């Protein structure tokens, strides 16, 4: 069949037609354990019953009107997002790139400065602003010239950061765990130093929680575990559990810099997205739920260490909560292909890291099942090494 799609994705040939919880079924009836969650989107699993009910009920009332009118659902979701954290205002959009774009615009508008510092191997989006912020050349090839006034320093390198910080820096944007960059957690000392330097030079501290947010690491936002106080936090992906929605969350003091007409979104905060986000947050914010995520994260890391520590091609196992990276000594594309054949869907994070992003509702039994499937594949000698 001739495709009329731009070939912007390296698609696998399998096509899925049904999903439920942690499982998906392809068009041949084969069932898979999904440890991708749509790249960290379906944190509550596929077709979560109460999220589905909330969306279905909203579809019977009103889908979309305009942000020129009052929307009480937006207020409810904003309250859920800012509850128990030192952030006050929310701007709703449709994706992580849009949330980060809003953060960059707000930082420049509020500070009156233009220079933004991010990290090498970071990923912040594919719009011109967020692509310029991203610290990976492969994302930018062929699209230049990019926006000026973006600097990239090595992740977790305090010395390099200090060398570029000055009064001209509007903001520092960083991920608590670099997802696309290899599932690499930020050092606490690095995040603390960013906070200190931002205070010193009057810069905004922006945390990108597009992939780590909404419970992925065992707290609603990963930064909450680090004892830091950012000016802005961005989130998306799991906020709608598959319904497109993103959010930029900022301190009250930034509110006067985004006035009527200064920024906006046609679809951002629409009723259907807000219905999904409200239910997602009501489920994800439960302390018992978050505690289970922490426990499952510890459990799967322990099981992976036990089963893979003596496997020659395994170089490192790391992660935070249910965001796990298995670093290998060589490229992992063949492993991922073989795991798919075995019935386990996983992701890459760079050329040599297997990334696991299971739904947060995953059971210990399913985690064990995945670990043994991974062990089987990485220990199979006839798996080709690219």
UniProtKB/Swiss-Prot annotation:
<comment type="pathway">
    <text>Amino-acid biosynthesis; L-arginine biosynthesis; N(2)-acetyl-L-ornithine from L-glutamate: step 4/4.</text>
</comment>
<dbReference type="GO" id="GO:0003992">
    <property type="term" value="F:N2-acetyl-L-ornithine:2-oxoglutarate 5-aminotransferase activity"/>
</dbReference>
<dbReference type="GO" id="GO:0006526">
    <property type="term" value="P:L-arginine biosynthetic process"/>
</dbReference>
<dbReference type="InterPro" id="IPR015422">
    <property type="entry name" value="PyrdxlP-dep_Trfase_small"/>
</dbReference>
<dbReference type="GO" id="GO:0005737">
    <property type="term" value="C:cytoplasm"/>
</dbReference>
<comment type="similarity">
    <text>Belongs to the class-III pyridoxal-phosphate-dependent aminotransferase family. ArgD subfamily.</text>
</comment>
<dbReference type="InterPro" id="IPR015424">
    <property type="entry name" value="PyrdxlP-dep_Trfase"/>
</dbReference>
<dbReference type="InterPro" id="IPR004636">
    <property type="entry name" value="AcOrn/SuccOrn_fam"/>
</dbReference>
<dbReference type="InterPro" id="IPR015421">
    <property type="entry name" value="PyrdxlP-dep_Trfase_major"/>
</dbReference>
<dbReference type="GO" id="GO:0030170">
    <property type="term" value="F:pyridoxal phosphate binding"/>
</dbReference>
<dbReference type="InterPro" id="IPR050103">
    <property type="entry name" value="Class-III_PLP-dep_AT"/>
</dbReference>
<dbReference type="InterPro" id="IPR049704">
    <property type="entry name" value="Aminotrans_3_PPA_site"/>
</dbReference>
<feature type="binding site">
    <location>
        <position position="265"/>
    </location>
    <ligand>
        <name>N(2)-acetyl-L-ornithine</name>
    </ligand>
</feature>
<feature type="binding site">
    <location>
        <position position="123"/>
    </location>
    <ligand>
        <name>pyridoxal 5'-phosphate</name>
    </ligand>
</feature>
<feature type="binding site">
    <location>
        <position position="126"/>
    </location>
    <ligand>
        <name>N(2)-acetyl-L-ornithine</name>
    </ligand>
</feature>
<feature type="binding site">
    <location>
        <begin position="208"/>
        <end position="211"/>
    </location>
    <ligand>
        <name>pyridoxal 5'-phosphate</name>
    </ligand>
</feature>
<keyword id="KW-0963">Cytoplasm</keyword>
<keyword id="KW-0808">Transferase</keyword>
<comment type="subunit">
    <text>Homodimer.</text>
</comment>
<keyword id="KW-0055">Arginine biosynthesis</keyword>
<dbReference type="InterPro" id="IPR005814">
    <property type="entry name" value="Aminotrans_3"/>
</dbReference>
<keyword id="KW-0028">Amino-acid biosynthesis</keyword>
<keyword id="KW-0663">Pyridoxal phosphate</keyword>
<dbReference type="GO" id="GO:0042802">
    <property type="term" value="F:identical protein binding"/>
</dbReference>
<protein>
    <recommendedName>
        <fullName>Acetylornithine aminotransferase</fullName>
        <ecNumber>2.6.1.11</ecNumber>
    </recommendedName>
</protein>
<feature type="binding site">
    <location>
        <begin position="96"/>
        <end position="97"/>
    </location>
    <ligand>
        <name>pyridoxal 5'-phosphate</name>
    </ligand>
</feature>
<keyword id="KW-0032">Aminotransferase</keyword>
<dbReference type="Pfam" id="PF00202">
    <property type="entry name" value="Aminotran_3"/>
</dbReference>
<feature type="binding site">
    <location>
        <position position="266"/>
    </location>
    <ligand>
        <name>pyridoxal 5'-phosphate</name>
    </ligand>
</feature>
<feature type="modified residue" description="N6-(pyridoxal phosphate)lysine">
    <location>
        <position position="237"/>
    </location>
</feature>
């Amino acid at each position: 069949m001739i495709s009329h799609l731009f070939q912007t994705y390296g698609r696998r040939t399998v096509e899925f037609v049904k999903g439920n919880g942690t499982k998906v079924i392809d068009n041949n009836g084969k069932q898979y354990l999904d440890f991708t969650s749509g790249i960290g989107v379906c944190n509550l699993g596929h077709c979560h019953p109460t999220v589905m009910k909330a969306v279905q009920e909203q579809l019977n009332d009103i889908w979309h009107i305009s942000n020129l009118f009052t929307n009480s659902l937006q207020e409810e979701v904003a309250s859920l997002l800012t509850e128990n954290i030192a952030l006050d205002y929310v701007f709703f959009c449709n994706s992580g790139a849009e949330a980060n774009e809003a953060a960059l615009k707000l930082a420049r508008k509020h500070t009156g400065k233009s220079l933004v510092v991010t990290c090498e191997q970071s990923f912040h989006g594919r719009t011109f602003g967020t692509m310029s912020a991203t610290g990976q050349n492969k994302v930018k090839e062929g699209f230049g010239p990019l926006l000026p006034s973006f600097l990239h320093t090595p992740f977790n390198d305090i010395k390099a950061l200090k060398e570029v910080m000055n009064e001209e820096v509007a903001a520092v944007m960083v991920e608590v765990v670099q997802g696309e960059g290899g599932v690499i957690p930020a050092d606490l000392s690095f995040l603390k130093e960013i906070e200190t330097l931002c205070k010193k030079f009057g810069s905004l501290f922006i945390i990108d929680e597009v992939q780590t947010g909404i419970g992925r690491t065992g707290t609603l936002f990963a930064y909450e575990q680090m004892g830091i106080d950012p000016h802005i936090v961005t989130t998306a992906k799991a906020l709608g559990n598959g319904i497109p929605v993103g959010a930029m969350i900022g301190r009250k003091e930034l509110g006067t810099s985004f006035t009527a007409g200064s920024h906006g979104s046609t679809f951002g905060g629409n009723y259907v997205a807000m219905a999904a986000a409200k239910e997602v947050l009501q489920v994800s914010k439960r302390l018992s739920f978050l505690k289970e995520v922490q426990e499952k994260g510890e459990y799967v890391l322990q099981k992976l260490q036990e089963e893979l520590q003596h496997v020659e091609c395994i170089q490192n196992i790391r992660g935070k909560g249910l965001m796990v990276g298995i670093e290998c000594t060589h490229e992992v594309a063949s492993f991922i292909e073989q795991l798919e054949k075995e019935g386990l869907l996983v992701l890459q994070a760079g050329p040599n890291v297997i990334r696991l992003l299971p739904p947060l509702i995953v059971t210990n039994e399913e985690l064990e099942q995945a670990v043994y499937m991974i062990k089987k594949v990485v220990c199979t000698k006839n798996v080709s090494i690219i």
